[in-house]
């Protein structure tokens, strides 16, 4: 059976899967980099890894917007989450993941813009900067970006745990919707 581009009632299509796994890899990179920063401290590997953080964050922000729009476009044809408590839990869990994946990089962009400093991502200038810091923009991001990122990591861990429960305990083939 050939892979379809769009989602259907049985499995996610190639676009949804591609966006999911691209974001999974980039989020792993982001969290691993912050882990290296915490464990190793200042070192060349830390400087390299953390030096990619803003650029990868911009890519993640772009991907989550595309992913959310694609999800809305496919809303009526996506595999059902089911009803009852677990169906509601899945919907709330996915909504929380999407919200955090949008809010965390959006706060970073707000902080960057409010800092008045330029933003260059992989050699491309996205924000010129050159103005005074705007505290009402930087303060919320300074307070919440890192904290919400760790909340996102906890939500991702919960997501992975439930994937493992579906596959190894409930043996209900839900995992196949995203990987086969």
Regions found by a protein language model. Name each.
Residues 1-180:
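Membrane-embedded alpha-helical bundles that constitute the cytochrome b-like, heme-associated redox core
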């Amino acid at each position: 059976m050939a892979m379809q581009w769009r989602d259907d009632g049985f499995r996610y299509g190639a676009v949804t899967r591609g966006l999911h796994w691209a974001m999974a890899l980039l989020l792993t990179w982001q969290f691993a980099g912050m882990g290296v920063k915490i464990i190793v401290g200042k070192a060349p590997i830390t400087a390299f890894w953390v030096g990619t953080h803003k650029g990868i964050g911009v890519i993640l922000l772009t991907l989550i917007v595309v992913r959310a729009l694609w999800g809305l476009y496919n809303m009526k044809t996506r595999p059902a989450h089911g009803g009852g408590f677990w169906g509601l839990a899945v919907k709330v869990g996915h909504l929380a993941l999407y919200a955090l994946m949008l809010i965390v990089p959006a706060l970073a962009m707000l902080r960057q813009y409010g800092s008045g400093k330029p933003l260059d991502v992989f050699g491309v200038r996205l924000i010129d900067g050159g103005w005074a810091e705007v505290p009402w923009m930087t303060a919320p991001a300074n307070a919440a970006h890192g904290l919400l990122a760790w909340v996102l990591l906890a939500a991702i861990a919960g997501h992975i745990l439930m994937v493992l429960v579906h596959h190894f305990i409930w043996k209900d083939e839900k995992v196949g919707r995203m990987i086969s």
